[in-house]
From Swiss-Prot:
Pathway: Amine and polyamine biosynthesis; agmatine biosynthesis; agmatine from L-arginine: step 1/1
Organism, scientific name: Neisseria meningitidis serogroup A / serotype 4A (strain DSM 15465 / Z2491)
Lineage per the UniProt record: Bacteria, Pseudomonadati, Pseudomonadota, Betaproteobacteria, Neisseriales
Protein family per UniProt: Belongs to the Orn/Lys/Arg decarboxylase class-II family. SpeA subfamily.
Function comment: Catalyzes the biosynthesis of agmatine from arginine.
Pfam families the UniProt entry points to: Arg_decarb_HB, Arg_decarbox_C, Orn_Arg_deC_N
Keywords of the record: Decarboxylase, Lyase, Magnesium, Metal-binding, Polyamine biosynthesis, Putrescine biosynthesis, Pyridoxal phosphate, Spermidine biosynthesis
Protein name (database record): Biosynthetic arginine decarboxylase
E.C. no: 4.1.1.19
Residue positions binding substrate: F279, D280, V281, G282, G283, G284, L285, G286, V287, D288, Y289
MF annotations from Gene Ontology: arginine decarboxylase activity; metal ion binding
Length: 630
């Protein structure tokens, strides 16, 4: 059976969708425009350059605004093609929900891209940002989320400023406030209604859709809303129908089912005299984190073109059947826009690797359990084909449990316990070499042994800050070394962050057609492990990241790549300092320095050492929150 390379099992050809690839030297390259083959940069060389020019300290988050622009073009193009093929006469507007990533660099990159799109806000603070970035050109703005009068007034101000602002009614109590505030401003509001569907997608985010969804109106509440607007002579204000099946939909059938049900709402609202002009299908466009094209939680079984065709065809069929006008289709595809544009590069600060040790046989007077373990060990070499491979491991497990029990009651010494534990590892390692992946019955125990003997890589990052979804909902992200991908798989590894939390580990890794509990790695010197890349972290991760152990935002570099492969760092941020993080929890750095000074003055340190300590403490407050030792 041929030995696979890292490139072959990390699926970069699939999840990278052209933005990320591997060059002939085995380094990961970034290509912001997949059709421009010379517009590439090596992630390793980029990291080295930023470290040299900006004295950047790892970890660094690299962001590629050109990928954002290309994602806009791709999604717009997919819906343009779908509309042409269906003969769809309505328009299309891609709306960016800024909750996915509210960073200024993201919104400004989208607004300056030249690609048509709108913006969505889900809170008062987000609306304030949206109104500012919308600028002087007319922008379609969708206002979701729960609203108070101030939120509503700001939205109506946006309409007065020339934007096309839709206030989506999430609960019935909002409509009265909207009508009252609109009257005060002398403006006719554009209203939308979020319908709560029975349909919902499957996966980690399914609760955001369906009948038990936090948001939206039930069928009876939609009818009540129509009645209220009729009574107020404002039925013509209701122009947008919105629904949401859930984020990261893995199965295209869920998309088709949801569009079909929501199209029925469109038809019925028209029968009630409501002239719906915009059909907002919400989010749901998934990205393939696994690169497997399956309907699992972190993958999708469809392409972007299939998604667009499914949405457009579902709406057009309802319009054709009932002779209704084609509405403008809106999608809120935030994950599809932003996920690929950001990659975190981090260094490994330590490696813990299993090394077989030669052990001497127990002395004749040693306890029986130690002799039993030794007999198992010698039996492996003497009779490999005569017994079940599992039986040797099971016997070792039983004996080791007995060793621990005897140690706990004082019958064995610490040295004897250490000998037994090492011998058990030797037994497992030796037997593990005899298992065959071709035998289905062996696969489970092979996985278990791979996890037991995997290298432990201590990575200079916080899982809670940089990949919170990996911790919170077990989401899988592509992660692999950024060099050596053309080399054969020689080792297995598990990744641990530097927080003081046992949850700070990555448990799932891409492994060809499946998911494994260990990460395939090339051979590498223990004292010089490769840099690691954490990919597709551009959606939600920066915003959801938390301050566990006061690890802060990483350094960030915004990079533009030229057609000749030359790159420019257009913006660089050093990330949070220790002082920044302490201020978040109301620790005043000046007060801390004062207290350091008081302690040093009351100590018996020599003057030179006292001054040195004070300078080091001050430098520590102004330093990076991550480990800085080279």
């Amino acid at each position: 059976m041929p030995i696979l390379t890292i490139r072959e099992v990390c699926n970069i050809n699939h999840w990278g969708i052209g933005y990320y690839d591997v060059d002939d030297s085995g380094e990961i390259i970034v290509r912001p425009n997949p059709s421009q083959h010379n517009q590439i940069v090596s992630l390793q060389k980029l990291t080295e350059a930023v470290q040299q020019k900006h004295q950047a300290r790892l970890p660094v988050l690299f962001c590629f605004p050109q990928i954002l622009e290309h994602r806009l073009r791709d999604i717009n193009r997919a819906f343009q093609t779908a509309r042409e093929e269906c003969g769809y006469k309505g328009g299309y507007c891609l709306v960016y929900p800024i909750k996915v990533n509210q960073h200024r660099r993201v919104i400004e990159s989208l607004m300056s891209s030249g690609q048509p799109h709108g913006l969505e806000a889900g809170s008062k603070a987000e609306l304030m940002a949206v109104l500012a970035h919308a600028g002087t050109r007319q922008t379609l703005i969708v206002c979701n989320g729960y609203k108070d009068r101030e939120y509503i007034r700001f939205a109506l101000m946006g309409e007065k400023l020339g934007h096309q602002v839709y206030l989506v009614i999430e609960k019935l109590s909002e409509i009265q406030m909207v009508l009252e505030e609109a009257e005060k401003l002398g403006i006719k509001p554009r209203l939308g209604v979020r319908a709560r569907l029975a349909s919902q997608g499957s996966g980690k985010w399914q609760s955001s859709g369906g009948e038990k969804s936090k948001f939206g109106l039930s069928a009876s509440q939609v009818l009540q809303l129509v009645d209220i607007l009729k009574q107020k002579n404002r039925l013509d204000c209701l122009q947008l129908l919105h629904f949401h099946l859930g984020s990261q939909l893995g199965n295209i059938r869920d998309v088709a089912t949801g569009v079909h049900e929501s199209a029925r709402f469109y038809v019925e609202l028209h029968k009630l005299g409501v002239n719906i002009r915009c059909f907002d299908v919400g989010g749901g466009l998934g990205v393939d984190y696994e690169g497997n094209r399956t309907q699992s939680d972190c993958s999708v079984n469809y392409s972007l073109n299939e998604y667009a065709a499914t949405v457009v065809w579902g709406i057009s069929q309802a319009c054709l059947e009932h002779g209704l006008p084609h509405p403008t289709i809106i999608t809120e595809s935030g994950r599809g826009i932003t996920a690929h544009h950001a990659v975190l590069v981090a260094n490994v600060i330590g490696v813990e690797r299993y090394k077989p040790r030669r052990l001497d046989a127990p002395s004749p007077e040693a306890p029986r359990v130690l002799h039993s373990m030794w007999e198992t060990w010698t039996d492996i070499s003497a009779s490999r084909e005569k017994r079940s491979l599992r039986s040797w491991i099971h016997e070792g497990q039983f004996d080791l449990a007995d060793v621990h029990n005897q140690y706990n009651v004082g019958l064995l010494s610490l040295a004897q316990r250490a000998w037994a534990e090492q011998l058990y590892l030797n037994i497992c390692h030796e037997v593990g070499e005899l298992f065959n992946e071709k035998h289905r019955s062996h696969r489970t125990i092979i996985d278990e042994l791979q996890e037991r003997f995997a290298d432990k890589l201590y990575v200079n990052f916080s899982l809670f800050q940089s990949l919170p979804d990996a911790w919170g909902i077990d989401q899988l992200f592509p992660v692999c070394p950024i060099t050596g991908l053309n080399e054969p798989i020689a080792r297995r590894a598990v990744l641990l962050d530097i927080t003081c939390d046992s949850d700070g580990t990555i448990d799932h890794y891409i492994d060809g057609d499946g998911i494994a509990g260990t990460m395939p790695m090339p051979d590498y010197p223990e004292e010089e492990p490769p840099l690691l890349g954490f990919f597709m972290v551009g959606a939600y991760q920066e915003i959801l990241g938390n301050m566990h152990n006061l690890f802060g935002d990483t350094a960030t570099a915004d990079v533009v790549v030229g057609e000749d492969g030359q790159f420019t760092v257009i913006d660089y941020d050093e990330g949070n300092t220790v002082a920044d993080m302490l201020e978040y929890v109301y620790q005043d750095p000046k007060e801390l320095m004062k207290r350091y000074r008081e302690q040093i003055e009351h100590s018996d340190l020599p003057a030179s050492q006292a001054m040195s300590f004070l300078k080091e403490l001050e430098a520590g407050l102004n330093g990076y929150t991550y480990l800085e030792d080279e």
